[in-house]
């Protein structure tokens, strides 16, 4: 809760300072305050709705099944491993789910540390040793213990807010200038068609650029989740799990859930837009102990 309050206060303070600067430079119009509020509502609103619905959406997207009562030895081992590690990490027991996929993969999601979900693929259970699987589960438990889902939502909310606000502010200035709007009584947005066209293009461009920030933060949290796993089950187990992942198939999970999947192979696309660091970098970070301090 303190983390949420701090992020909201920081975001509000920056927006107020930005509004003051606009006022002093004469750029501010009567609608800027309303634009700031609208950007904040839409920017944070979408991010928090996604967070609150994350467990339901994640299970639905992969066809996951929550284990209510273990039906076999593998499910019993999985539930007991999650229970033991969550106790070690000081969090409430997450829901445990399995989904059918050939990929060696797992993910964690949930709106709160004490109301979370850990899901693993059948491919992981079939193709990893118990030690390797323990390390992967510990990685997901570390995401939960670190509060990464909430933190990523707050970061995404701030980024969304500024993308919406700056895009529409620039669109307002451009459309007003092109329409020759100089009278107080006229719409501050100038030509509506120009306004929405410019705002749409800028939101797309700024959104792509802003994703560099969110993906950088996601990669940073992955290193810490790897370190958390090493602390829970041992460095060598986590290294072995990452080495195993180097030979696995690419994961198919998309969107916000992808940020908390264990797999993260380097793709041909720029590393700037990757949610996970390359596996070799993660292994090297564990060996050097960079994030274990």
UniProtKB/Swiss-Prot annotation:
Coiled coil: none
Family per similarity comment: Belongs to the peptidase M48B family.
Species assigned in the record: Pectobacterium atrosepticum (strain SCRI 1043 / ATCC BAA-672) (Erwinia carotovora subsp. atroseptica)
One GO cellular component, as annotated: plasma membrane
The protein's required cofactors: Zn(2+)
Name recorded for this polypeptide: Protease HtpX
CDD domains: M48B_HtpX_like
GO BP of this protein: proteolysis
Highest classification ranks of the organism: Bacteria, Pseudomonadati, Pseudomonadota, Gammaproteobacteria, Enterobacterales
Sequence intervals crossing the membrane: 4-24, 34-54, 158-178, 193-213
């Amino acid at each position: 809760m303190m983390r949420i309050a701090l992020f909201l206060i920081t975001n509000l303070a920056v927006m107020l300072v930005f509004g003051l600067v606009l006022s002093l430079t004469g750029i501010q119009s009567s609608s800027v305050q309303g634009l700031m509020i609208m950007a904040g509502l839409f920017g944070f609103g979408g991010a928090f709705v996604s967070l609150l619905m994350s467990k339901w959406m994640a299970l639905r997207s992969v066809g996951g099944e929550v284990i209510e009562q273990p039906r076999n030895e593998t499910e019993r081992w999985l539930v007991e491993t999650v229970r033991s590690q969550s106790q070690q990490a000081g969090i409430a027991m997450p829901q445990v789910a399995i989904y059918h996929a050939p990929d060696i993969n797992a993910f964690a999601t949930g709106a709160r540390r004490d109301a979370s979900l850990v899901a693993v693929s059948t491919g992981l259970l079939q193709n990893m040793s118990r030690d390797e699987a323990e390390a992967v589960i510990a990685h997901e438990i570390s995401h939960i213990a670190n509060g990464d889902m909430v933190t990523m939502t707050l970061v995404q909310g701030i980024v969304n807010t500024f993308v919406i606000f700056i895009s529409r502010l620039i669109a307002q200035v451009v459309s007003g200038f092109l329409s020759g709007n100089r009278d107080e009584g006229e719409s501050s947005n100038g030509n509506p068609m120009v306004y929405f066209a410019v705002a749409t293009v800028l939101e797309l461009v700024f959104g792509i650029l802003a994703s560099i920030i969110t993906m950088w933060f996601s990669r940073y949290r992955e290193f810490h989740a790897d370190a958390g796993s090493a602390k829970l089950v041992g460095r060598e187990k986590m290294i072995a799990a990452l080495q195993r992942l180097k030979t696995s198939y690419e994961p198919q999970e998309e969107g916000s859930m992808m940020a908390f999947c264990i797999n993260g192979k380097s793709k041909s696309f720029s590393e700037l837009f990757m949610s996970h660091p390359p596996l070799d970098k993660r292994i090297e970070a564990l060996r050097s102990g960079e994030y274990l301090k």
